[in-house]
């Protein structure tokens, strides 16, 4: 993620230098990027470990564990989504099971594009589309699935 952040800064700096008149007209920046992934940030605001992205398949066993803990129908009825490896929640459960020392350091979990947003603005946040893709969002209530979060102890 730090390489991505450095590349973002270099690209923006280059564009501003190349197009100073146009860059003076910028009123805002929008973020678009990879949906599925897990970026973990500690209380100090720094990355805890490398991101786990959507293509990572290591959390297969954690998917069944999530369903066992929450009840498959309850889970799916809340998030309106099926679980898959590489989703934020399944990857987070993998970290909880296999990297307890890293799990304990977590203050925030964000999606990859939201890490860039955080670095640029200093604010943690996401949008409804990405939130729902993390598979721990109550889509009907448009809020985090706090009941599931409590059951999973995350």
Regions found by a protein language model. Give the residues of each.
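Short, charged, surface-exposed secondary-structure boundary motifs
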Residues: 61-65, 136-138
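Short, surface-exposed amphipathic charged segments that create phosphate/polyanion-binding patches used
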Residues: 66-70
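Short capping micro-motif at the N-terminus of alpha-helices
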Residues: 49-50, 127
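N-terminal glycine/serine-rich phosphate-binding loop of ATP-dependent small-molecule kinases
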Residues: 1-49, 61, 77, 105
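Residue-level structural signal for beta-strand termini and adjacent loop
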Residues: 52-53, 130
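Gly/Ser/Thr-rich active-site cleft segment
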Residues: 75-154
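Carbohydrate-associated surface elements
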Residues: 56
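General structural feature for long, well-ordered alpha-helical segments within catalytic domains
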Residues: 4-11, 59-62, 91, 112, ...
């Amino acid at each position: 993620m730090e390489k991505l952040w450095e590349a973002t800064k270099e690209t923006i700096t280059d564009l501003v230098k190349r197009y100073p008149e146009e860059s003076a007209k910028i009123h805002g920046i929008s973020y678009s990027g990879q949906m599925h992934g897990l970026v973990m940030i500690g209380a100090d605001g720094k990355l805890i470990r490398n991101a786990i992205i959507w293509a990572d398949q290591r959390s297969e066993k954690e998917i069944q564990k999530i369903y066992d803990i929450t009840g498959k129908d309850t889970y799916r009825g809340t998030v309106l989504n099926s679980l898959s490896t590489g989703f934020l929640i399944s990857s987070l459960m993998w970290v909880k099971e296999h990297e307890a020392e890293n799990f304990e350091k977590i203050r925030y979990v964000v999606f990859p594009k939201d890490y860039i947003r955080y670095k640029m603005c200093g604010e943690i946040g996401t949008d409804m589309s990405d939130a729902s893709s993390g598979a721990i969002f109550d889509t009907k209530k448009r809020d985090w699935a706090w009941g599931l979060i409590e059951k999973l102890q995350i």
